[in-house]
């Protein structure tokens, strides 16, 4: 995930990370900086996460807006190791920098009681009265896993605009297409799902699924639910029953299944089933 290894050896990035001597995630964030402003921002984030605020405020954005002497000193040390002498820390760069090193800790709210699901599938939680708990999406780089609860406690997090983050970091998103049977309408429906790890970012109708996907989904739906899911007209139902009897009485013929598939596809092409 951090790009530190190539096979069983350190990659070029891994060697840079090791030279910094930081926590691997923080080192990955630091070496990912592409310019001086990103480096200055990453250095300040790292300083805050190494020595988090003790006032109980879990908002990383609030902490970042402060200029604590210890954080400034540590930031300068890290920038010196990176051979960076300029640059300004910029709050608009925090989310994409964090996402590169803590993608598995992107979190989406589940319920109104401060509970979140992380992209890695784990649960996490804030106090229900924490101001951050009003927001649907967070990145939570600092967690505490206790023994009393299956959910980790979020110690420090940043609220994020998920659409903006996806636009700036498209590599975070996996895309999958699904064609499935809709029981309510008796038709096939196709969806495109965008996910970050185990979190669904967006689900949207898929306009033109492949014929193979349609065919397989149709077969799966009929196999699971039976032929009754096809919304037969009275005439078509009578024909189906007659063919069922014919297949029972004349088992040596194999025309029944082929004919049924042909009938269905003709109905589908005429628009009886809509995607």
Model-predicted regions and their roles:
Residues 6-34, 40-43, 114-116, 122-124:
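Accessory beta->alpha helical hairpin/"wing" motif in late/C-terminal subdomains of nucleic-acid enzymes
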């Amino acid at each position: 995930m951090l790009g530190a290894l190539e096979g069983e050896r350190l990659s070029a990035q891994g060697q840079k990370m090791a030279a910094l001597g930081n926590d691997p995630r923080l080192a990955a964030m630091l070496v990912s900086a592409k310019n001086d402003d990103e480096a200055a921002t990453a250095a300040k984030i790292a300083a805050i996460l190494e020595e988090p605020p003790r006032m109980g405020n879990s908002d990383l954005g609030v902490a970042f807006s402060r200029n604590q002497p210890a954080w400034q000193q540590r930031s300068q040390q890290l920038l010196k190791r990176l051979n960076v002498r300029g640059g300004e820390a910029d709050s608009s760069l925090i989310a994409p920098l964090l996402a590169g090193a803590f993608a598995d800790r992107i979190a989406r709210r589940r319920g109104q009681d401060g509970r979140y699901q992380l992209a890695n599938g784990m649960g996490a939680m804030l106090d229900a009265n924490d101001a951050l708990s009003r927001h649907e999406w967070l990145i939570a780089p600092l967690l505490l896993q206790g023994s009393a609860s299956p959910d980790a406690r979020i110690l420090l997090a940043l609220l994020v605009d998920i659409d903006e983050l996806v636009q700036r970091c498209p590599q975070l998103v996996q895309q999958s297409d699904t064609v499935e049977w809709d029981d309510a309408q008796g038709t096939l429906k196709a969806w495109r799902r965008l996910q970050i790890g185990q979190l669904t970012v967006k689900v949207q109708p898929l306009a033109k699924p492949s014929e193979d996907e349609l065919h397989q989904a149709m077969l799966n739906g009929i196999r699971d639910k039976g032929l009754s899911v096809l919304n037969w007209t009275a005439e078509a139902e009578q024909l189906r029953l007659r063919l069922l009897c014919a297949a029972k009485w004349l088992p040596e013929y194999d025309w029944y299944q082929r004919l049924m598939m042909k009938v269905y596809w003709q109905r589908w092409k005429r628009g009886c089933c809509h995607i």
